[in-house]
UniProtKB/Swiss-Prot annotation:
GO terms for biological process: DNA double-strand break processing; double-strand break repair; double-strand break repair via single-strand annealing; gene conversion at mating-type locus. It comes from Schizosaccharomyces pombe (strain 972 / ATCC 24843). One of its GO terms (cellular component) is mitotic spindle. This is Uncharacterized protein C1322.02. GO terms for molecular function: endodeoxyribonuclease activator activity. Coiled coil: none annotated. It comes from the Eukaryota.
């Protein structure tokens, strides 16, 4: 006890402090319990937080929700003096001594600015040696043999040219005749159906010959060997396919159903003419009606089918014209097979 001017200092009662702390803790526990009850029963207080049920003036309970927010930088960033516009402005000011000329009315908006020159497109060509590739401009590649990957990408970028309705040829939207020329040879692979001319390609990407398909030519294609025109030497198609990075030469389009049948009769290797081959049916895999059904199930065949038979009562189809269409799309069948296929489906046709 300290005495000062006859007065005694008030004594500090520790029990009172403990009671106040207990009351504060008890009130806090009650508020938490009430908050949990409201969160379970009512839907509206779910948006509230725990600190909204606490008294702000309660000094004994630490308000842990007050977290010091980091300093928010202003949205306006400093002007970059290294941008394209600032660099061009600086160059223009150095070139023109008078700065006032920059803002004069005599200058037009087009007289000042930054333009990026467009580079000419470069294409790779396959030369005599496979390793050496010459880069040429777009104007020069018409007289060159373009690399197959470049040729395919160019052909895919071209817009397809649809034929007239009376031609009934190449109705598949992916097929088109390119404007580049016959010297770019991998058209046999990028067309939706087999083209009416086979391009024979050498190991170095050169065009060896062109061959119109026939039944005998189709037999040679199925055997994997095709004969050069006016030459006894045989040309290995598998070797030509490996020249373009292809392990197996595709006799039909990738992604399309192959024109093969369930029959397992082997193709007889013979030297007969086309008439005897057709009469003796030595090629059952080619001269089969299921090839017609397979063709009309393909995307291009569906379009042709709907075009021909959208009004079958009013439209009478000539079987010779239909056979010519099938032959041009790579489906080789005899006329009798086509007649039987049409009769099974009750399609009106003219012989």
């Amino acid at each position: 006890m300290i005495e000062s001017k006859g007065e005694t200092a008030p004594s500090l009662n520790l029990n009172d402090v403990n009671v106040e702390e207990n009351d504060a803790a008890q009130s806090f526990a009650e508020k938490v319990q009430r908050f949990r009850y409201q969160m379970k029963v009512h839907a509206a207080p779910r948006q509230k937080t725990l600190h909204s049920f606490l008294k702000k003036d309660n000094a004994n309970i630490h308000d842990f929700t007050k977290v010091e927010k980091p300093h928010i930088r202003s949205s306006k960033s400093k002007v970059s003096y290294n941008s394209i516009t600032s660099r061009v402005t600086k160059y223009f000011e150095e070139k023109n001594n008078s700065v006032d000329q920059l803002h004069s009315e005599s200058l037009t908006p087009l007289s000042f600015g930054h333009t990026i020159p467009k580079k000419k497109p470069l294409l790779m060509t396959a030369s005599v040696s496979e390793d050496s590739r010459v880069r040429v401009s777009k104007r020069q590649f018409k007289s060159k043999v373009v690399h197959p990957e470049i040729a395919i990408s160019i052909a895919k970028r071209h817009k397809p040219k649809f034929p007239l309705s009376d031609e009934l040829m190449n109705v598949e939207p992916g097929f088109h005749h390119s404007n580049i020329g016959c010297q770019i040879t991998p058209y046999l692979w990028i067309s939706s159906f087999r083209t009416n001319v086979y391009y024979l390609i050498g190991n170095e990407g050169d065009l060896l010959s062109q061959q119109v398909p026939s039944i005998s030519g189709e037999l040679n294609m199925l055997r994997g060997v095709c004969t050069r025109i006016d030459d006894d030497n045989r040309y290995d198609i598998e070797q030509a396919g490996s020249c373009f990075g292809m392990s197996v030469f595709p006799t039909s389009d990738s992604g399309e159903e192959s024109f093969t049948t369930l029959e397992s009769d082997p193709i007889v290797n013979c030297e007969h003419d086309e008439k005897k081959v057709a009469d003796n049916l030595l090629v059952p895999q080619v001269m089969c009606s299921s090839n017609i059904s397979t063709f009309f199930r393909s995307p291009g065949g569906k379009k042709l089918y709907h075009y021909l038979w959208k009004n079958s009562n009013a439209l009478r189809i000539s079987s010779n014209d239909l056979l010519e269409i099938l032959l041009k799309h790579g489906v080789y069948v005899s006329l009798d097979t086509l007649h039987s296929w049409l009769q099974e489906r009750n399609v009106n046709f003219e012989k």
